[in-house]
């Protein structure tokens, strides 16, 4: 729930609107978590974050998952971030079980 604390509202939701300091804080936190999970991080010109877990076949097409880390002004705790964190949880589960994948 560390992410939910960033921009937490009195109503129990989150307010991390795009391009704000709170959005940056959430993005930095996610990048730290992804690096801790062994992912490489790339950020494109638009600010999209690509966290990549290496596969045994670097030429294979990657498995993709995506969502967003910013919220609407009255977004709930899981507005957007749920999909991002679900993908990171899959990576952490693969790592914890010692499972390698051919696709990045």
Predicted features, each with a name:
Residues 1-75:
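Acidic/His- and Gly-rich active-site-bordering loop/insert found
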Residues 65, 75-104:
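Alpha-helical metal-binding/catalytic segments enriched in His/Glu/Asp
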């Amino acid at each position: 729930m560390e992410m939910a604390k960033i921009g937490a509202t009195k109503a129990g939701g989150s307010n991390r609107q795009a391009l704000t300091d709170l959005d940056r804080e959430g993005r930095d936190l996610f990048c730290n978590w992804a690096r801790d999970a062994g992912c490489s991080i790339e950020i494109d010109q638009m600010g999209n974050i690509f966290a990549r877990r290496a596969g045994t076949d670097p030429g294979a097409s990657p498995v993709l998952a995506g969502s967003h880390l910013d919220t609407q002004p009255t977004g709930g705790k899981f507005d957007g971030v749920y999909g991002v964190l679900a993908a990171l949880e899959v990576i952490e589960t693969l790592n914890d079980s010692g499972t390698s994948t051919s696709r990045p």
